[in-house]
Amino acid sequence: MNDRISINLIYLVLTFCCVSAATVRTAKNDDIQKFTIQMIGYSPQKTDDYVAVSIEATPGYVVAFEPMAHADRVHHMLLYGCTMPASEQGFWRGMETCGWGGGSYILYAWARNAPNLVLPKDVAFSVGHEQDGIKYFVLQVHYAQPFAGEVHDFSGVTMHISQKKPMNLAAVMLFVSGTPIPPQLPAFQNNITCMFESSTPIHPFAFRTHTHAMGRLVSAFFKHDGHWTKIGKRNPQWPQLFEGIPSKLMIGSGDQMSASCRFDSMDKNRTVNMGAMGVDEMCNFYMMFHYDAKLDNPYPQGAICAKDYPSKMIDYPKDGFELLPSRPELEHHAHQSKVPFGIVQEAIHENLGGVKLGQVAGLAFNNEQQLLVFQRAGRVWDASTFDNYNILLDKKPIADPVILVISYSGNQTKLERKLGGGQFYLPHGIYVDKDGFVYTTDVGSHTVAKWKIEGNELKNIWTSGELLMPGSDQHHYCKPTGITRVEDQLYVTDGYCNSRVVVLDLNGKRIRQFGLPGEDAGQFNLPHDIVSDSAGRLLVTDRENGRVQHMTTQGHVIEEFKSTMFTNIYSAASHEDYVFMVPGRPIMGHETEGIAVFVGRSGTGLIEYAFGPTTKGKREQMGPQFGQPHCLRVCPDGGHIFVGDIAEGKARLWQFKIRHDQN
């Protein structure tokens, strides 16, 4: 493996590759299983980097596809069904997908942030059966450029697989041209034509177009008895989804199928060839069709059309050449970043404004996008901090300020104010609501509190729980850990001893609670952090169960984020539809491999990419790595990520910047 790949993530990559390149989950409909094939935590090594992973196909019928990728990171993905993969290794570099001597079938294609695809009723792809020739799934991923920073990608596709054989089987035909594009032309057409020769009629029901930056329109029609019928047309600069065909179509034996790609080469001073690289172009029209499951497969070895018969295109419909009206909102959504995506380590802070950091236990942003750092100053939580009954032994509050309010620009910080001296015993969680009130949890005093900042003073509004007295009843907490607000209620993770979420009103009055000790859904083994997402749902960090539970405010589990790549999760944060998670400890037995931040997509329960501190390549050249990450937050505009570290003797605040075009 190239030395450039982050050493601290190599173990994670290899674990994911060797243990499983697929995840199988049962959907709410018991007939449907969700089968996911993912990249192995790859970091592209060059421009136009093609890689692939394979996994043995599970028998069934695919009725839907969920992509798990973003155009910031991935140029496109192609999912194939293969009799044999091109390599037996499970992962390989290069453009090969299916092996020689067997079938090669396109099942799905994705680019430019295309959405999910659900097939029509009674239509599905047959996979994993002897007669369909698909024994393996192969996912090919094209990365346009290397990432910035130490980012590792787990993009993939989730298939919804049923065991019920449908009335109609699905397949995909690819129309592809190899004609070069001359320079300085406002409109150049690449044409493709084939004759349909099977006795099994086919019914197109969806289509997808694909070009690179020069493409302006891709269309396809078929000709029956001298009459042209449109299959579809679309601007390839829009999200490259499979668009449904509204009318019922049938292509029969002897019909002509044709496609055309329109290119604009006015800004080119050389001929542009067709090819897989970014400097090349592509002319692709994907036609998804179904046929009667009782009839023979019309394309038993895979469906492709790559011929050009100019004489047969003379009467191609004018509509197939005419541009569609501009759709700026689609072009923006489909935008592929020209700036390499990355999460770059921007700074490591060991002191802020002359204040040496203690263990950084909590982080929060206020309404001015200033960061509140909740740190323990000179007090350290170790084996001598509590007795066997969870009672704090040093009952004096921390004299030094424990809340540091900072502003930041680039890697420079400014200490705006210092708060909380003499008011806290062992800081843990902190949150600032939309009204500017500050909420804290203190594991030393076993309390939850609401505060108001007045100048350089921290004024207490109320305190919930009995000072320095742990308990599990309705009036006590035992080492409460995190707090967040959703609408007019507060949600407290309680915590190290009680394995519950306590719900308060804004005046600190208890309303209810949910959660029990355990590892089932809705149970906890040390709920360590809690945040809310943009929809007002909760993300509870279930630390020792090694997961984040995505829950309603009533405590019902929507999904969980869990992986073999970590055994514990200390903190989580949410921005838009992404969930950021950080373990506090490496996997036992692999302590030298380091720790990474994992990022999943809401609604999937899967990890989509990971990142960590900067490395310089070889192990002996590695820079500072995470010690014991304890808290993580993403700034409100999504541009920065901060991680608080409580490692003994190495308390730090890590600062990362998310790089993409919007920055």
Curated annotation (Swiss-Prot):
Q: Which residues are the signal sequence here? A: 1-21
Which cofactors are named for this entry? Zn(2+); Cu(2+)
- What InterPro entries does this protein map onto? 6-blade_b-propeller_TolB-like, Cu2_ascorb_mOase-like_C, Cu2_ascorb_mOase_CS-2, Cu2_ascorb_mOase_N, Cu2_ascorb_mOase_N_sf, Cu2_monoox_C, NHL_repeat, PHM/PAL
Q: Specify one Pfam family.
A: NHL
Q: Which cysteines are joined by disulfide bonds?
A: 82-98, 194-305, 261-283, 478-497
Name the PANTHER family for this protein: PEPTIDYL-GLYCINE ALPHA-AMIDATING MONOOXYGENASE
Protein name according to UniProt: Probable peptidyl-glycine alpha-amidating monooxygenase pamn-1
Question: Which gene carries the instructions for this protein?
Answer: pamn-1
